[in-house]
Amino acid sequence: WFNKSHRRYGTLWAERFKSLLVEPTGRAIETVAAYIDLNPVRAGLVDDPKDYRFCGYGEAVAGNPDAQRGLLSLRNETDWSTAQAGYRLALFGTAAAPRDHAVSVTPEALQQVVASGGKLPLTTLLRYRIRHFTDGAVLGSQAFVQQQLAAYRTLHHRRARTAVRLMPALTDWGGLVTLRGLRKPALG
């Protein structure tokens, strides 16, 4: 009944969730973790991810030992306070505008800056939906993405019609590349 009345097909969650293979070390995993932890901020649920108990960062700040071990591993640290401070800086950026100002940046203003050739801080971009983090298939360093592409070609005994793609020149991505080139705008 639901599918017929809403002109849909499949299960209710069909096409809702996607997967992305992320390089498990370095800049790629930390960038994606920050992007995920900023989901409640992008949704307008909270101003600070520490206030949202259903995200990993909020759980870690609240004292959950499993979440804290995850952040320690992510930051490659042994001291919780150092790891927490470093990750918080990664979330908000040391040179970023005050949080309230950064949240109030509209998509139109963002597009104007991009059109003028200006680059935005990664911390500002992480407050928007970045399609490469959901539709890029593989995200990581160039060597990691090349390795995954070679494994795919070997496993399926065919040549994939894709190649390593650079992330859009909106900011300094720290060497991150993706497997899939996207035709639609990167943000939104």
Language-model segments: which ranges?
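Short Pro-Cys-Gly-centered "Cys-loop" motif that presents a nucleophilic cysteine in a tight turn
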Residues: 1-188
